[in-house]
């Protein structure tokens, strides 16, 4: 069995018991802090619209990207396409899929996958959702209403009336739960 080499750690004392202290100083910098250092200023963001680098909340795009991480190798099916369309609709407010958007790409992938015999030639979830947050104009924080809409869309598209474990509906629901705890 191989032994792992650990980088030197700062010694812990009795008063220094927070878990993150054993790894050194932990800090965060917001965009406002960077702007102040550079002499710029940012306008106050709309609280319902996510900003890049937000550490406090989970956006719809980030929830979709989480699906790409958890089920990236899974071929896109109609259930996934319906859930992605519902998520994109909730993020953008547009009921019709945008050309080049996630929903249109997912629907095309599902249709292609139904006609493709070889598993290795099928379009996977990661192919569609890896950069979802960047591809969603107006990405916003996931709410429980957003998650419910996506769960409903995925259920309606399933012959078994089940959502995919670790799929789009699960990721949206997890994001909404995290956001409610904040």
Curated annotation (Swiss-Prot):
It comes from the Eukaryota. Its main location: cytoplasm. It is found in: Cytoplasm; Nucleus. GO terms for cellular component: cytosol; nucleolus; nucleus. It holds the Pfam family SMP. A motif (Nuclear localization signal (NLS)) lies at residues 7-11. Residues 10-21 have a biased composition (Basic and acidic residues). GO terms for biological process: intracellular monoatomic ion homeostasis; response to lithium ion; seed germination. Residues 58-115, 123-181 form the SMP domain. Residues 1-51, 145-182 are annotated as: Disordered. LEA proteins are late embryonic proteins abundant in higher plant seed embryos. The function of those proteins is not known. Belongs to the LEA type SMP family. This is Late embryogenesis abundant protein 3.
